[in-house]
Amino acid sequence: MKEYQQSAKYYDRLLAPFIRPIRYKVLKVVKKYHYKTILDVCCGTGDQLKLLKKHGFAGEGIDLSEAMLAVAEKGKEKVSCFLEDATQMHYSDAKFDLVMTAFALHEKNHATAQKIVEEMLRVTAEGGDILIVDYELSEKTSLLSKMAIYFIEWLAGKEHYRNFKSYIKKGGLPELLSATPLKEVERYYFGQHGIVVLLLRKEGR
């Protein structure tokens, strides 16, 4: 993940003011359902896991960027984050009560994003939950929000931007999740209806 080698050092500092309300919403959801085993897929710098640990919830994370994981190792709150491909997790089936990912699916090509969703589903316990934070653009999304999101994604680089546009064109999260047995539990919007926090429950096929 070479594209993150330079950005990892300032990633949290740059984005934290915008993402912080979302991080705290995720914390509120975790508190509400009292999850015991938590996995953060594509955990980046571990910011969400550190916030959860600060409030008494232990979890672990995986990411494919050594630079991001190097940042995750720093700070007062120590969390367990591992270098691993989210499309081929080593975890056994149905291991976690909650599997979450934030702002990861839109930046992957479609096949990779689908595989990550499949793997998240595999390692989630029956009756457990999957929480996804990502872009969801619709007629309810403000023009300002759409412009800001497209600009941010353009800044992230050609491949990232290409995958983002494909994600939006194909239908975003609804399309990625359409073939899964997941049932929506809760949803919350941020960024003038441009970002969704989506909680889903794994039910038997």
Language model segments and positions:
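A short glycine-rich, Lys/Arg-flanked "PGG" loop and its adjoining helix->strand segment in the class I
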Residues: Q114-E126
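A conserved beta-strand element that flanks and buttresses the S-adenosyl-L-methionine
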Residues: M100
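Core SAM-dependent methyltransferase catalytic element
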Residues: T180-L182, E186-R205
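Class I SAM-dependent methyltransferase SAM/SAH-binding core
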Residues: L39-V41, T45-Q88
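Short catalytic micro-motifs in class I SAM-dependent methyltransferases
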Residues: F103-A104
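C-terminal alpha-helical "lid/dimerization" subdomain adjacent to the S-adenosyl-L-methionine
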Residues: Q48, V133-T180, E186-R187
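Nucleotide donor/acceptor-binding cores
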Residues: Y35-T37
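Conserved class I S-adenosyl-L-methionine
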Residues: M1-Y33, D47
